[in-house]
């Protein structure tokens, strides 16, 4: 598992593809069956390894793909290191938003449900 930040095990900056694969791997097997609402998020990664991917909860299943999602509920924009801190539970998404390390656009109520997905990953 790669630690916080965007450095690989070889201390090289991770590409967007590597960041995406790491996120997808960390959430494989996440149980979202109790989430009955449709949730669709787009994540825009900024900085040297910029790119976009989406996370969707649909019919109790989690989908993560390296594409933009145009009919999304919310868009999260942050650097990769902030994203990994949130995923690892080292930074609360609300705190990251308050500290302006995470930008959120769209339905804030549905955006807050991201915490449910993260909590079910463990």
Segments from the language model and where they lie:
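Feature captures hydrophobic
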Residues: 2-122
């Amino acid at each position: 598992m790669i630690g916080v930040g965007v450095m690989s095990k070889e201390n090289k900056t991770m590409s967007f593809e590597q960041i995406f694969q790491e996120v997808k791997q960390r959430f494989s097997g996440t149980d979202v069956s109790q989430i009955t609402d449709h949730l669709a998020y787009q994540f825009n990664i900024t900085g040297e390894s910029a790119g976009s991917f989406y996370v969707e909860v649909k019919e109790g299943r989690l989908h993560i793909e390296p594409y933009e999602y145009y009919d999304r509920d919310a868009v999260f924009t942050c650097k990769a290191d902030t994203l990994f801190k949130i995923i690892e539970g080292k930074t609360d998404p609300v705190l990251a938003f308050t500290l302006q390390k995470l930008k959120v656009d769209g339905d804030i109520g549905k955006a807050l449900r991201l915490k449910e997905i993260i909590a079910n990953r463990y």
